[in-house]
């Protein structure tokens, strides 16, 4: 099955602690059905000191389940994703809310 959410997409969080926040997907984990979104779902991690970096408590993004995020449409609202096959046989993603192509 083709991926409905891909790296580089602007998404909004639908459920959870960060509900309503938006960010850009920078990693998708299809086997886990999860994604990492920049600046969303931050958790504190204890990092051991190494020669390269300093130790301490750092904030980093935790994975969010794909069912809890949705792509932001051109109108700024969350939209579902569908697929459409163009005349030349290319499969493209479309926004169900507006019918506009997400990627061309």
Curated annotation (Swiss-Prot):
Whether Heme counts among this entry's keywords is no
Q: Which SMART domains match?
A: KOW
InterPro entries listed in its UniProt record: KOW, Rib_uL2_dom2, Ribosomal_uL24, Ribosomal_uL24_CS, Ribosomal_uL24_KOW, Translation_prot_SH3-like_sf
- UniProt-recorded Gene Ontology molecular function terms: rRNA binding; structural constituent of ribosome
User: Which keywords annotate this record?
Assistant: Ribonucleoprotein, Ribosomal protein, RNA-binding, rRNA-binding
From which residue to which does the signal peptide run?
Answer: none
GO cellular-component term (any): ribosome
Superkingdom per UniProt: Bacteria
Q: Name one GO biological process term.
A: translation
What's the subunit arrangement here? Part of the 50S ribosomal subunit.
Which family does the record claim for this protein? Belongs to the universal ribosomal protein uL24 family.
NCBIfam families linked to this entry: rplX_bact
Q: What is this protein called?
A: Large ribosomal subunit protein uL24
* Organism lineage string: Bacteria, Pseudomonadati, Pseudomonadota, Alphaproteobacteria, Hyphomicrobiales
